[in-house]
């Protein structure tokens, strides 16, 4: 018997859940940090971590598997060109979940999901300011 294996249902149909996790995964890979509820963040981590592990070996088969799950060519390119090489030496644990308190409307626990070892936004702003001078 299965006994509760797989992802949480999150009070959604299977199609809605798949689409939501796919959209959240694309957003996380694009922006490298997103704010969401804590249960969604924990499920997102279970989906994103294997994708980054897949990107560490850039074969055609792995790119096709990534496209099958992401359905976004730009994110597949970013995954294999930037994120795969960035985490080449890390054996796992590519995401970090930080608790951010509770949402005002319904008191839902909120969390920030971010990729570890991501470039600092403040450093990019300083580099842009230095280049402008």
Curated annotation (Swiss-Prot):
SUPFAM superfamilies: Prokaryotic ribosomal protein L17
UniProt KW keywords: Ribonucleoprotein, Ribosomal protein
One Gene Ontology term, aspect cellular component: cytosolic large ribosomal subunit
Any one GO biological process: translation
Domain of life of the source: Bacteria
Protease found in the keyword field: no
Protein's UniProt keywords contain Ion transport: no
Single GO term (MF): structural constituent of ribosome
Assembly mode: Part of the 50S ribosomal subunit. Contacts protein L32.
UniProt-listed PANTHER family: LARGE RIBOSOMAL SUBUNIT PROTEIN BL17M, RIBOSOMAL PROTEIN L17
Name of the protein described by the UniProt record: Large ribosomal subunit protein bL17
Gene encoding the protein: rplQ
């Amino acid at each position: 018997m299965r006994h509760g294996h797989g992802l949480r249902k999150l009070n959604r149909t299977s199609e809605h859940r798949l689409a939501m996790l796919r959209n959240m995964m694309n957003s996380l890979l694009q922006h490298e940090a997103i704010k969401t509820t804590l249960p969604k963040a924990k499920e997102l981590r279970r989906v994103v971590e294997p994708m980054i592990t897949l990107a560490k070996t850039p074969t055609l088969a792995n790119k096709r598997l990534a496209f099958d799950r992401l359905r976004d060519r730009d994110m597949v390119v970013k995954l294999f060109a930037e994120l795969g090489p960035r985490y080449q030496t890390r054996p796992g644990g590519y995401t970090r979940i930080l608790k951010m308190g509770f949402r005002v409307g319904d008191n839902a626990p909120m969390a920030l999901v971010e990729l570890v070892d991501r470039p600092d936004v403040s450093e990019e702003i300083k580099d842009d300011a230095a280049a402008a001078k």
